[in-house]
Amino acid sequence: MTFYNHKAIEPKWQAFWADNHTFKTGTDASKPKFYALDMFPYPSGAGLHVGHPEGYTATDILSRFKRAQGYNVLHPMGWDAFGLPAEQYAMDTGNDPAEFTAENIANFKRQINALGFSYDWDREINTTDPSYYKWTQWIFTKLYEKGLAYEAEVPVNWVEELGTAIANEEVLPDGTSERGGYPVVRKPMRQWMLKITAYAERLLADLEEVDWPESIKDMQRNWIGKSTGANVTFKVKDTDKDFTVFTTRPDTLFGATYAVLAPEHALVDSITTAEQAQAVAEYKRQASLKSDLARTDLAKEKTGVWTGAYAINPVNGKEMPIWIADYVLASYGTGAIMAVPAHDERDWAFAKQFNLEIIPVLEGGNVDEAAYTEDGIHINSDFLDGLDKACAIAKMVAWLEETGVGHEKVSYRLRDWLFSRQRYWGEPIPIIHWEDGTSTAVPEQDLPLVLPVTKDIRPSGTGESPLANLTDWLEVTREDGVKGRRETNTMPQWAGSSWYYLRYIDPHNDEQLADKDLLKQWLPVDIYIGGAEHAVLHLLYARFWHKVLYDLGVVPTKEPFQKLFNQGMILGTSYRDHRGALVATDKVDKRDGSFFHMETGEELEQAPAKMSKSLKNVVNPDDVVEQYGADTLRVYEMFMGPLDASIAWSEEGLEGARKFLDRVYRLITTKEIVAENSGALDKAYHETVKAVTEQIEGMKFNTAIAQLMIFVNAANKEDELYVAYAKGFVQLLAPFAPHLGEELWQILTASGQSISYVAWPTHDDSKLVENDVEIVVQIKGKVKAKLVVAKDLSREELEKVALAHDKIQAEIAGKEVAKVIVVPNKLVNIVVK
């Protein structure tokens, strides 16, 4: 039996593509454009795993398909190479993180090339390259000039073990850091912030303009968290002080019986009575040790301390005790809430715990037993009594504005973006702080501000980055003799990934971020594929920067990514014992189709789980390419199921994909290829062209491959294969299995040219119709024969064909035919005497 040799074919075509610059981005302005973007990887020491190629194969299929359809295709790859692991490695080994990063990139690139992706490597970018981060820094200076980058003393999520502050999004629900699982404490520090809140409304509204999964849009909407309500001002009794509360339910103000301030609220110390001072100070200390997520966990026990002070409810003049509690965050809203315990579960639980008054102001429920959180007619509310929610809110807002104690307000959950990191391995922030108290951005002609090479990258110990140790780099003097100090914080890893898709468009431009005409030609990105784990942060940050650049006139579109697709996760095989505990694969024995724990002998249950080093179920693509070939890996990952589904890896599935490709190879190399078309495969071929084209467009790659299999089965039943159909089929296969596609194309054409730019096959609708039909011939209602006849044969012709059939002749010999009933395209029934 014939098999193809992937170890010979694949390197041969990879070398051909590289030598001939086959995938150089097209620049013919008369052609339509297609920009296919992958979420570029962080080049870790572990290298590529089989999850990476799933998304990469999808964009590659689309890119190859669009090239064949006559598009200019931009399909680039690069490296998101700043990041903590490289710095941690450098601290552990004393090596330069740049060396570690370069080695990892070389390994990633080798692995990616072995999989036959059609990247234009002339456009490769690396976020740690000064010629790249010059423009990351340039964008920062523009943010600074527009007042969108500012310094603030803010409580940050400080991780002692990492020596840095991390963003809220990087804190896990258990209050530890996403990276390393270390404890997170709140600590006030000078930080750079980006004013993403200034773009909240546009970030929300423009989600309507992009073709993204609704689930991802919803995650962004919830993160932005728009709510409409009112700001209400409460005076503090017996003082000239007041505080403001934002509420979405100003109509429940008559039910507000106490107020709660965040422990960090600026008023707390000045209103706390002497009797309560010690308890308040201790509570503030404890709150500072908790992350925002831990503090706002709905399930946690409510804690709080009374300040000894009272607020005055503006609608009824009642005194409301002012408490502090850690579930109120200084960074959210105004850092103060009015509590309406009758109609809010958290306020109700707090009021019950501390024996505070509960006044119902909406009809319905029993507030002695639980908070009533449904809508209802207003009661105990003076001028709002008898009104429904909408009318009551409108009337209360009008009253607040007339009396000068409040006004309508739109609020967002979105916070400004904490942009500094106290680490070495990141882009230096291009700001100089002068001894006269002013700060200035490094001028454009002095960019990039290059990260200095140093052996000493331990944290400085002062909360500043290791750059604070490098005096020569740190200290500067202005022309007028004024001394200054460079900013020591570096940018987060998100910085370089917030605009990289723009640099691919013009990666070697020294004069500007990218040429205006080229940006106009290529934007927006037509398809962006990557993991759903970046649903909020990366995509929100990139959209924010893009909108700033749009306002600056740098980019021509409001949104960067027209269509977004999240591939599913490839799960590993795992085994669980009777307790549900996972057992590493090297501790499992397979016997007669069952699985047993090698040490305990217990029978185990097999189930998919996320691939992890600890379970020893990570599959390395190098091993798959070695054994089965890159084309097999590509076809298998696309055939596993829908692209967005999470599916378990299976060795059997891999073998099935390889067998299919071997059958394709045998079909083209051993079947007689002929110049004359017998017509036998017309329908199968044209159906395949139509279906595969539509399914690639719709990213239904698994059904496209299934259709290719149907054609192979049909072709194998015939003695010969029409050359045009053989070529067309190989073209349809090539985006999925490009090495085999090229090899078979040369066998069929001997052209010496790549298949990549050969025009994509088209189908003929007239060939999709069946020309023949099968009819049954009955005698007295019993089936005696089945005939294949031309479609739409007349009744007379059908009767003639049926009566002339050998089997029927034998059945009716010596009998009189009384009647023949004909149903065209279906049956002939002969009645005999």
Swiss-Prot record:
Gene3D superfamilies reported for this sequence: HUPs, Isoleucyl-tRNA Synthetase, Domain 1, Valyl/Leucyl/Isoleucyl-tRNA synthetase, editing domain
Pfam families: Anticodon_1 (PF08264), tRNA-synt_1 (PF00133), tRNA-synt_1_2 (PF13603), tRNA-synt_1g (PF09334)
PROSITE patterns reported for this sequence: AA_TRNA_LIGASE_I
Motif 'KMSKS' region location, chain numbering: 610-614
Chief localisation class: cytoplasm
Subcellular location: Cytoplasm
UniProt GO MF annotations: aminoacyl-tRNA deacylase activity; ATP binding; leucine-tRNA ligase activity
Keywords from the UniProt entry: Aminoacyl-tRNA synthetase, ATP-binding, Cytoplasm, Ligase, Nucleotide-binding, Protein biosynthesis
Residues given in the record as ATP binding sites: 613
Protein origin, superkingdom: Bacteria
Enzyme class: ligase
GO biological process: leucyl-tRNA aminoacylation
InterPro entries: aa-tRNA-synth_I_CS, aa-tRNA-synth_Ia, Leu-tRNA-ligase, Leu_tRNA-synth_edit, M/V/L/I-tRNA-synth_anticd-bd, Methionyl/Leucyl_tRNA_Synth, Rossmann-like_a/b/a_fold, tRNAsynth_Ia_anticodon-bd
CDD domains xref list: Anticodon_Ia_Leu_BEm (cd07958), LeuRS_core (cd00812)
Keyword hit for Cytoplasm: yes
EC number: 6.1.1.4
Catalytic activity from the UniProt record: tRNA(Leu) + L-leucine + ATP = L-leucyl-tRNA(Leu) + AMP + diphosphate
Any single Gene Ontology cellular-component annotation: cytosol
Motif 'HIGH' region per record, residues: 41-52
Membership in a protein family: Belongs to the class-I aminoacyl-tRNA synthetase family.
PANTHER family listed in its UniProt record: LEUCINE--TRNA LIGASE, MITOCHONDRIAL, LEUCYL-TRNA SYNTHETASE
Protein's name in the database: Leucine--tRNA ligase
Source organism per UniProt: Streptococcus equi subsp. equi (strain 4047)
